[in-house]
Amino acid sequence: MKSLSDKVEHIVVLVLENRSFDCILGNLYPGNPRFDGLSGTESNPLHGGDPVRAWKNNARDPASMSIPTPDPGELFDDINMQLFGLGGRPGAQAPAMNGFVDNYVRQTGDDGAAFRPEAVMHSFNPEQVPVISALARQFAVIDRWFASAKPAATGGSTSTIFRRRWR
């Protein structure tokens, strides 16, 4: 009898820049305790304001499909704040993942206006991303995969993925 790993013929790694697992697939299997998706209770603090809750809509118009616009910050300082919060630093403790909203509102658009805090907490319904949802339902989804790299911008994160030794 073949083991499960003997049955695997191909591994496909899909990397989506500037979108989190929760944003794209977090609503794929609602209420399934075996899937580490969104529960509907997630939020992120906003310094000096109320916590900003995760949210979704059902619209399929161009504006809804491009939330957040612009993309969240992707430089080292941005990622560090997103993971460890305001003034947080990498260390022995696990990242609190509590700085996404604070980091997003500190960015400004070309017109100098601050970004809307709720935009970075948006997620899609499976119907809004039908192709990737269908692929995820037909194949395995790894919902608890974490890179062992320090916070890095896109280039560093991508090179970590492709440098990985697959066995």
Predicted feature locations:
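N-terminal pro-sequences and low-complexity stem/linker regions of secreted or lumenal proteins
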Residues: 1-167
